[in-house]
Amino acid sequence: MPKKNKKVNAAILIIGNEILSGRTQDKNVAFISNWLNAKCGISVTEVRIIPDVEKIIIKNIKILSKKFNYVFTTGGIGPTHDDITAKSIAKAFKTKYEFHKEAYQILEKYYGKKNFNDGRKKMAKLPRHSKLIYNPSSAAPGFIIKNVFSYQEYHQF
């Protein structure tokens, strides 16, 4: 259970070797922080940037989901081999990592059966009992499980 505070708080967890190496510049922290503070009255009180390493993702999800009312993650939910965030979050919450029927249907419709390859199908695998976050920029949805919101790029909202 998240720690109860007088003010609702949140942490941001940026996941990606490309951020840590400097190959990619983060565009999400400022957007999420401004949006949560200005629109929702939620204080962002911690930001972490971690690599695409399962043990590290699991550890951080466990810690942050207990410490904060909300946790917002970015990165690691795409079609490539290093996109392991959804699977790691499932493990952190000790739940199954499986195809989400609605996510699968959305992605299959978007890409078409011919172009719906294994990498794209992987984006339809989520922790069991996740709720979808619809993506206005592409078909790839994010998800919510417990107090963790996982989305590829929040600045697209």
State what each model feature region is.
Residues 15-17, 73-81, 152-154:
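Glycine-rich beta-strand-to-loop/alpha-helix junction loops that act as flexible
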Residues 56, 84-152, 156-157:
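Proline/glycine-rich low-complexity loops and linkers
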Residues 22, 50, 151:
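Active-site-adjacent beta-strand anchor residues
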Residues 15, 19-29:
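Glycine- and acidic-residue-enriched helix-capping/strand-helix junction motifs
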Residues 7, 30-92:
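N-terminal small/polar loop signature for handling phosphorylated ligands or for N-terminal nucleophile
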Residues 5-11:
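Extreme N-terminal starter segment of soluble prokaryotic enzymes
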